[in-house]
UniProtKB/Swiss-Prot annotation:
Residues 194-462 form the SF4 helicase domain. InterPro entries: AAA+_ATPase (IPR003593), DNA_heli_DnaB-like_N_sf (IPR036185), DNA_helicase_DnaB (IPR007692), DNA_helicase_DnaB-like_C (IPR007694), DNA_helicase_DnaB-like_N (IPR007693), DNA_helicase_N/primase_C (IPR016136), P-loop_NTPase (IPR027417). The gene is dnaB. It is an enzyme of class 5 (isomerase). GO terms for molecular function: ATP binding; ATP hydrolysis activity; DNA binding; DNA helicase activity. Keywords: ATP-binding, DNA replication, DNA-binding, Helicase, Hydrolase, Isomerase, Nucleotide-binding, Primosome. Belongs to the helicase family. DnaB subfamily. SUPFAM superfamilies: N-terminal domain of DnaB helicase (SSF48024), P-loop containing nucleoside triphosphate hydrolases (SSF52540). This is Replicative DNA helicase DnaB. PANTHER family: REPLICATIVE DNA HELICASE, REPLICATIVE DNA HELICASE DNAB. The main replicative DNA helicase, it participates in initiation and elongation during chromosome replication. Travels ahead of the DNA replisome, separating dsDNA into templates for DNA synthesis. A processive ATP-dependent 5'-3' DNA helicase it has DNA-dependent ATPase activity. CDD domains: DnaB_C. Homohexamer. It catalyses: Couples ATP hydrolysis with the unwinding of duplex DNA at the replication fork by translocating in the 5'-3' direction. This creates two antiparallel DNA single strands (ssDNA). The leading ssDNA polymer is the template for DNA polymerase III holoenzyme which synthesizes a continuous strand; ATP + H2O = ADP + phosphate + H(+).
Length: 468
């Protein structure tokens, strides 16, 4: 007797994956459960969006449910059927009969959130398949793209899917939803007791926080100064203050200074011990050693500071490493880059202006993607040295066009004593806000304690005009 042809296991696998992952039963249970119990809506809306439903008719039904909830209308068999009829899509979803079937086949809504999780998980699998296909296509036909760019795009797309496990409402939003969340945030802030007005990450400097309301999520913040003004010191102080005030990590990319030197500066700053003594290890007395030990213990207890001192980093390197720390630690409070001009973008290496533009653009995109403030240090042009008033302005930023455009906040550091030996403002630094997208420009004065590698609040402030 002739043997039957055998089906290869690979053919079976192909047949199994030809239909994208989905669960019709789970989708039906979610929709039927909502009709039975509207009180579960908020939990459902946090887990799934209309596009998570594989079946087209289910997407239409869920979309109409969203409209009804937005209008504070109950969702039941009658109201949903009438709403679908008024939009002319009742026949497309199967009419009243199909809605009744959904309702009748769902005995209760006890497990509705578990069903919603199934719908979302299947949607994520479909997204992974789609992304995987695009990655494969780009790999087969790279079209001259650098391998790092292909890897970065692949990582970005997969990372975006992972993020959607907690935020499934990306894409265009109706302004009604945005208004509700905005008013809710304003209401929460208005009810806080002893609220300082800081809505972002505190800078640690009272008057600077008053001007900026802190360093805001998704903002690109540029800190610029001529050499010897304390640019890196100020940046590290921002990192220290953010790390001490927040539980989420601070990530520092130090392209100029080794990690040990960064830590020496931070220890000197927080312990208020002369940084020369720390750097040389000489003449430290018992009190100073105790201060150092206390700061070390504080860092170990917080355990929320990461330093990457790799040199020559590209935007791809910074993005991938930031995403990893973000993912492994459940978020970030701030990212610091010291400094922008030491980064490189190989694809634009023939044109420095375009290279800086790409670096600046990528840092802004990273801030928006991770919803954290990204602080980047920048150099200033030497031409300001030729002016009588050497206080920096936005046009003094080296390769300034793209940096000025991408930045949400630009801060310059100016210390008059660097230029004038007889300055009346010895030990005083001006933080000049040259641009603030959502706030005023102006100046803030801080105390500069160079021996401790730190800036401090200035007890007595002189009045400065904010017309700078």
């Amino acid at each position: 007797m002739a043997s039957q042809p055998q089906i290869k296991s690979s053919d079976k696998k192909t047949a199994q994956v030809s239909i994208p992952p989905h669960s019709t039963e789970a989708e039906q249970a979610v929709l039927g459960g909502i009709m039975l119990s509207n009180q579960h809506w908020d939990g459902i809306a946090e887990r799934v969006i209309a596009d998570d439903f594989y079946t087209f008719q289910h997407r239409l039904i869920f979309t109409e449910m969203e409209h009804l909830m937005r209008n504070q209308s109950p969702i039941d068999l009658i109201t949903l059927d009438q709403a679908l009829r008024s939009r002319g899509v009742s026949d497309e979803v199967g009419g009243f009969a199909y809605l009744a079937e959904l309702s009748n086949n769902t005995p209760n809504a006890i497990n509705i959130l578990a069903y919603a999780d199934i719908v979302r998980e299947k949607a994520i699998l479909r997204e992974l398949i789609s992304v995987g296909n695009r990655i494969a296509e780009n790999s087969y036909s790279p079209k001259g793209q650098d391998i790092k760019l292909i890897l970065d795009e692949a990582e970005r797309e997969v990372f975006a899917i992972a993020e959607k496990r907690t935020t499934s409402s990306e894409g265009p939003q109706n302004v009604i939803n945005v208004l509700e969340s905005t008013i809710e945030k304003i209401d929460i802030l208005s009810k806080l007791e002893n609220h300082s007005g800081v809505t972002g990450v505190t800078t640690g400097f009272t008057d600077l926080d008053k001007k900026t309301a802190g360093l805001q999520p998704s903002d690109l913040i540029i800190v610029a100064a001529r050499p010897s003004m304390g640019k890196t010191t100020f940046a590290m102080n921002l990192c220290e203050n953010a790390a001490m005030a927040s539980e989420k990590p601070v990530l520092v990319f130090s392209l100029e200074m080794p990690a040990e030197q960064i830590m020496m500066r931070m220890i000197a700053s927080l312990a208020r011990v002369d940084q020369t003594k720390i750097r040389t290890g000489q003449n430290l007395d018992e009190i100073e050693w105790n201060k150092i030990a206390s700061v070390v213990g504080m860092f170990k207890q917080k355990n929320n500071l990461f330093i990457d001192d790799s040199s020559g980093l590209t935007p791809t390197d910074v993005r991938s490493r930031a995403r990893r720390v973000y993912r492994e630690n459940g978020g970030l409070s701030m990212i610091m880059v010291d400094y922008l001009q030491l980064m490189r973008a190989p694809a634009f290496s023939d044109n420095r202006t375009l290279e800086i533009a790409e670096i600046s653009r990528s840092l802004k995109a990273l801030a928006k993607e991770l919803q954290v403030p990204v602080v980047a240090l920048s150099q200033l042009n030497r031409t300001l040295e030729q002016r009588g008033d050497k206080r920096p302005v936005n046009s003094d930023l080296r390769e300034s066009g793209s940096i000025e455009q991408d930045a949400d906040l630009i801060m310059f550091i100016y210390r008059d004593e660097v230029y004038n030996d007889n300055s009346e403002d010895k030990g005083v630094a001006e933080i000049i806000i040259g641009k603030q997208r959502n706030g005023p420009i102006g100046r803030v004065r801080l105390k500069f304690n160079g021996q401790f590698s730190r800036f401090d609040n200035l007890a007595e402030q002189r009045e400065y005009r904010d017309d700078y």
